[in-house]
Amino acid sequence: MPFMRILFFGLPAGVSAVVLRGLLADGRAVAGVVVPAASVPHLLPDPVPPIARLAPPAAAPLALALGDAPAGLLGCAWAAGLPVFAARALGHAGTLAALAAARADVACMACFTRRVPPALLALPPRGFLNLHPSLLPAYRGPQPLFWQLREGAPTGATVHYLDTGLDTGDIAAQTAVPLPDGLPGPEAEQRLALAGLALLRGVLDDLAAGVVRRRPQGPGSYQPTPADADFALSAGWPARRAYNFMRGTADWGKPYPIEVNGRTEWLAAADDFTEAELDRPSVRHGRHIAIRCSPGVLYARLLRR
C-alpha cells in the first residue's frame, strides 16, 4: 500500500520532533515541514515575508553529514533532506501557493500554535489531522496536560480532523494513556506524543486504504494558558493529585501556594506522598513540610522567601 504525501506542521521545540521522527522511520512520504514564523525569528529576514523557506545554519551541513543533527524538529527535517518553511501569514496567497506545491495528500499537526484558515484547511484533499494530548472533547486548548494534572483527570491522546474551531474537529482515533505517579512533565508529554503517533499511524494507513473513521465531538471544555494563580494547591485535594500536579508541572518553575490552617505556605517542589493520615494540618522540619490532604499526606520542600 503506497504511503500518502504528508505536509507536517509543528514547533521547533517540544514533542513535534517525536512525531515527525516516527513518520520518517516508517518510510512515509513527508513532503515538507511548516513552523510558525514567530518560533524562529533568528532565522528570518527583516521584514518577515508571509512564508520563507529555511536553510540550515552555516554549521549544520557538517553536523548533518556526521549524523550529529540537532534533536529538535528542524534538525530532524534537515537531516532527512526535507524543505522547511516558516509561515507568518497562513492565509496569504503566497503561503497557499508555496504549500500547494508540496502536493500533499494530507497534513499532520503536532503542537502547532496557529489557527489554520479555511483556505489552507482545504488544500490537502484528505484534510488536516491534529494530535492533541487529551481525551477530547475534554481539555481543549493550548496546555491540556497541565489541566489534566491539576484536576487529577484521566490522561490520553486524540487524533482529530482540524476544523475552524479550537480542537473541535471530528475525532479519528483516541486512547487513554495512564501516567505513573510523579512523572515529570516532559516525560509525560513524550508518552502522550508516542501514544498519539501510534494512533496517527493507524489513521494514515486507513486513509491510504480508503477507510475514513470520524465521529463528531460533543460539548467539551476549553482551558486557557495557565496563570500564576492556577498553580495554587488545596489541602482538600488527595495527596496523590497534589503530588502528581507538582511533579508534572515542575518545569514551569512556579511556586505552589497552599492554605494550611489559616496560613499560606509556599511550596517549591514535591518530594513524596502517602495514603497515611496526619493528626495535624502540617508538620515542618527545616525547609521540608508534611501537609495533611484529603486523603493522604503530601511531603514537599518550602520555597525560600
Task: Show where each model-derived region lies.
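One-carbon transfer enzymes
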Residues: 1-252, 257, 285-304
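A conserved acidic, glycine/proline-rich C-terminal tail/linker
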Residues: 269-284
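Short, isolated positions in well-ordered beta-strands
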Residues: 263-267, 296-299
